[in-house]
C-alpha cells in the first residue's frame, strides 16, 4: 500500500531540520533528540550502559557454557551480593520517557530503558535503529539467549522486535500511539548470531489509525514480515498512565 501525499506530508524527514514531531502539549524535535542520543554516553549513564553490557555477556555465557559447580556458585554469590547492594538505593521511576518510541519525552531515557533497544537494559539484544528518509532501519544480532528452534531466533522475540521497530516508524507521523494489532508472517527461520536488518515504514494514515509494514532479512533474504496497526493516543493520556503508576493505582485507558 502506498502512503497518500497528505499522509506522507505528516511524516518527519530527518534531513529537514525544521520539521518536528509535535505532542498535544509540546513540540518535540525528534532530529535534535536523536542526535543527542548518538553522542557518547558519559557519567552515570555510561556506567549503566557498561553494566548492562556485562550482564548481557553473563546471560549469554550462562545459557551455553558448562561451567563447574564451584564457578557457578561463586558467580551466583557475587551477583546476589550486588543485587542486595543495588536494592539499597531509592527506586527511581520518574518516567522521563516511556518504553514506546513515539511517547518518549526524553529520548535518552527511552533508549536506555526499552527492553528491545535499551542500552541500559540487559534484556535488550539491543537493536540499533536509524531513520533514513521515511523508513526506519534496524540492525540486530540475536545471541544464544534468544534461541527458539536450534540455531534460530525465538518467534516471540522477533514479534517484540517488530513491535518496537514499527513503533519507531509510526512515530514519524507525529502522533504518539499504541499497538492495536500486530500480524506476523514467518517466512523461514531467522538465524542467531547473524546480522539482521529490519526495514519499516508507514503505509497509510486514516484518522487515529496508523498502518505500518516491516521486514527482517538475513544475508539479503527476508525471513519474516509484519503489519502493524497503531492507534494514536494523546501524550497527556500517557502522562496520566505514568502518574497513576507512580501513585500505585491503575486508570482505565
Question: Across the structure, where does each feature detected by a protein language model lie?
Answer:
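Methionine residue identity
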Residues: 1-3
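HotDog/MaoC-like acyl-thioester-processing domains
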Residues: 19-99, 103, 190-192, 203-253
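Hydrophobic beta-strand-centered segment that forms part of the acyl-chain substrate-binding groove
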Residues: 27, 31-39, 165-197
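Long amphipathic N-terminal alpha/beta scaffold segment
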Residues: 73-145
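Active-site helix/loop of acyl-thioester processing domains in fatty-acid/polyketide metabolism
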Residues: 131-135, 153-176
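Short histidine-centered catalytic/ligand-binding loop motif
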Residues: 142-156
Amino acid at each position: 500500500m502506498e502512503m497518500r501525499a497528505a499522509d506522507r506530508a505528516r511524516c518527519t524527514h530527518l534531513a529537514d531540520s525544521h520539521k518536528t514531531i509535535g505532542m498535544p502539549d509540546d513540540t518535540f524535535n525528534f532530529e535534535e533528540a536523536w542526535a543527542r542520543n548518538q553522542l557518547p554516553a558519559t557519567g552515570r549513564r555510561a556506567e549503566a550502559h557498561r553494566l548492562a553490557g556485562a550482564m548481557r555477556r553473563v546471560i549469554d555465557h550462562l545459557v551455553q557454557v558448562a561451567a563447574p559447580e564451584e564457578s557457578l556458585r561463586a558467580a551466583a554469590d557475587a551477583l546476589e551480593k550486588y543485587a542486595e547492594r543495588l536494592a539499597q538505593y531509592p527506586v527511581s521511576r520518574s518516567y522521563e520517557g516511556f518504553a514506546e518510541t513515539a511517547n518518549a519525552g526524553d529520548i535518552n531515557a527511552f533508549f536506555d530503558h526499552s527492553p528491545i533497544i535499551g542500552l541500559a537494559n540487559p534484556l535488550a539484544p539491543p537493536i540499533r535503529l536509524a531513520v533514513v528518509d521515511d523508513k526506519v532501519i534496524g540492525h540486530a544480532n540475536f545471541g544464544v539467549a534468544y534461541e527458539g528452534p536450534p540455531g534460530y531466533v525465538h518467534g516471540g522475540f522477533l514479534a517484540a522486535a517488530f513491535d518496537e521497530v514499527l513503533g519507531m516508524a509510526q512515530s514519524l507521523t507525529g502522533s504518539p500511539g499504541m499497538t492495536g494489532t500486530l500480524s506476523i508472517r514467518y517466512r523461514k527461520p531467522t538465524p542467531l548470531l547473524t546480522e539482521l536488518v529490519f526495514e519499516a515504514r508507514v503505509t497509510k494514515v486514516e484518522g487515529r489509525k496508523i498502518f505500518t509494514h516491516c521486514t527482517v532479512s538475513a544475508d539479503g533474504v527476508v525471513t519474516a514480515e509484519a503489519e502493524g496497526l497503531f492507534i494514536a493516543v494523546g501524550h497527556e493520556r500517557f502522562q496520566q498512565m505514568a502518574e497513576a503508576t507512580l501513585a500505585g493505582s491503575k486508570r482505565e485507558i
